[in-house]
Structures are given as structure tokens and as C-alpha cells.
Amino acid sequence: MMGEDPKRWLMDHAPKKGIDALAPAISISAAARITGLSDSALRKYESAGLIIFHRTAGNVRMLCVEDLERIELIQCLIKKRGLNLEGILRLWALLPCWEFKRCRPESRERCPAMHDSERPCWVLLSGEKGCEGQLCRTCEVYRFGAYCTEDLKVLLRSLPGATKAED
């Protein structure tokens, strides 16, 4: 059960605690070999907004352990749940990032994610510094929100002000 604090729930469900899961260490070609996908499929995930790769100073894509786990999750959503890339984006767009981050009301009104149900916040803020000065790829909503796909209804019911389901 998630409990009362959705942000804490997301952090508790973070993948592989105890290692630096954000350290870019894997080239896109190595990631393709590990995942069994092609380089072009991984680039397609990036261009669709499903994943934010690290970029070196020379603009070379690099992945971290968390990126590999995210790719595995995307593959699971495609193969086991029958979603396509657009379906995954729309599902992730339902995550109320403003609740997880406890955004101030004035920030919420300016936030494009508050008014768009088709793209997750990190896609809407692409090319920007993210929200509240935090880079999207380091934000807990981007990093861990995707993992709550199975528990989305429970997650949404646990948010402050949400209507509780009747037993």
C-alpha cells in the first residue's frame, strides 16, 4: 500500500537502491546488445519522449542502469500490456507531477503539464531546465513515476483531496 505520501511511495519504489543508477556508463550500441533492441529503436524511444538519454560533450548518447530498467519497463508495457509508444506516453501523462512535487498554486497555473493530458511533464518541458530548476532526468516523477503504471488508480486515490473508492 502506498500510504499517505505519494512522493515517498515513488522514492520507495525506486529501482536498484545502493548503486549510482544515474551514472552514464553504457553506450547506445552496448545498450542495444543488452536489451536486444536496435540502436534505431532506442533512438525512437528517445525521440518519442519515453526516455531521456545522457549526452556527452560531443553529443554522444550514454545510458545508465536506470535507463536500462526503463527500457525493460517500456518493453513490458508493449509486449504484456499491448500498449504502443503513444499509449505509454498518454498513460504517463496522467501522473499528477504537480502533486508529487508539491508545487505551489501559482506554479501549477503556469505548468504546461497541468493542462495537457497527452504528454508527460518531461516531454512538455523538453529543451528547458525542467521545473523548479530541476533537470527532468533527475526528477523523481520522470525516474520513478513510470513504475507506478500497475498501481495508477491506487496512486491517484492516495493523493490529497482525491475521492476515495467505496468498499
Please give the residue ranges for each predicted region.
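Arg/Lys-rich, alpha-helical DNA-contact motif
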Residues: 2-28, 33-34, 52-58, 65-167
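Functionally constrained cores in energy, signaling, and assembly domains
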Residues: 31, 35-39, 44, 63
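Major-groove DNA-recognition helix of helix-turn-helix-type DNA-binding domains
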Residues: 39-58
